Amino acid sequence: MIVQDTNDNEPKFEKEFYEIDVDESLPKDSQIVPLNARDLDKGKNGRLTYTIIDRDPGVEDYIGVLPSSGIMFLKKQLDREEITSLSMTVRVQDQGLPQLSDTARVKLNIVDVNDNKPVFTAASYSFSVVENIAADSVIGVVTARDGDTGRNGEILYSIKSDSGKFRIDNPSGRTRNTSLSTKNSPQVIVQHWGPEKSGLQGSWPLINLVKF
């Protein structure tokens, strides 16, 4: 007597919902996660195939799944500044008759990396000050922008060189004088540094302080 296996067990994903953080710096063809499923049947009744059946716009361009293993991979590199997350439904199906299947929802959160330098909103600034301006007066404001998010987009300002005559407030970019008089400084050139907290440095605009 030969006992044949009948297709009486559905394939089952380990989880109904997968939420995965994906670093935007991962290169094309990187493996993201294996979507493991089990089927207790034997032979073709337990042979599984994985497909993406429902997806957000853009998923097809970026995400693929290996049919025989369920491993998700990148078709091309992600960019957190363009896409913040991708959601899809993955189906696993056996090869029996009738075919049995299961589905799982997958959400990929794109994690920002520090790939944008801060940029000042102007190449140079000119601020006019009176000769005997009071110490710690606000003489002007500089601003910078950064395309990254979270901590990677937080900007800290510092003064690169000015002989100790000025300081700059964070995170406002307000520039202040530290001494009462500018008598011997008909023109002072100050360079500001705008690095992000995580270390990428921006450009240094010139700031001309003209006494009147």
Give a label for each model feature.
Residues 1-212:
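Extracellular cadherin-type adhesion modules in metazoan precursor proteins
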